[in-house]
Amino acid sequence: MNNPWKNLPETQPYILPSDYELIDFENRNLSHDTIIQHHVLPEPYIGDPNAPIILLNLNPGYADEDVAFYNQKHVRILWKKNIHHSSMDYPFWFLDPSLDVEIGGARWWQTKLKEPIKTAGLQKVANRVCCIEWFPYHSRKFARLNKIIDSQNYGFHLVQKAISQKAIVIVMRSEKLWFESIQELRSYKHIYRLNSPQNVAISRKNCPTGFPLIETILMS
């Protein structure tokens, strides 16, 4: 499947042409908290989708500080390389040490991946972990749209490819939606859940069945 994100407009609104009509319609009825924030760059996935560890999340959140974060030239360069699946030293680009870890997604992800980073270091985690979002656009709170938008199918394709490559899959949030969208996940042997979908830290305590395997992969 071709990568549709190469067609994302370079100016606002940051919505794929194939998604625009439905998102524009839905946004008219969404609340302040659930409206889709198309003035910041979307995050359909973070990292190399061929990584051996795949995290399944719901959608990228939104805070007011994200505007300044994504407007940084260096951030936009890293974001574009990621979205195009270009070669990077830190494919999970929120772990790139050149970023300010006190702002935006860099702070959030370094907190959630604290134990894997402590185990293997930033670069190994950045090269062996990928997160795929069920819904690619930012919002303060998630609200399911009435239909699947076109770009979601590419994310589903990446997960199906990861399954075929026998990656381990960690469900961070919204198992029900992921299982509805990708039937293969229901019977997949290498899938693990977190004890707390509210605190989605990837840790031994929060993912007791999967974390030992994560450690093994990171240290190999």
Where are these regions (language model features)?
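Active-site and ligand/interface coordination hotspots across diverse enzymes
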Residues: 1-99, 152-154, 158-160, 181, ...
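Glycine/proline-rich loop-helix segments at beta-alpha junctions forming the active-site rim
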Residues: 1-7, 117, 127-220
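Short, flexible coil/linker elements and helix-boundary hinge sites characteristic
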Residues: 12-13, 121, 166
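N-terminal start-of-chain detector that recognizes signal peptides
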Residues: 24-29, 101-105, 141-142, 164
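A short linear-motif detector with a strong N-terminal bias
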Residues: 32-35, 107-114, 148-150
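Residue-identity detector for glycine
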Residues: 47, 61, 104-105, 121, ...
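Low-complexity, serine/threonine/proline-enriched polar segments
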Residues: 75-130
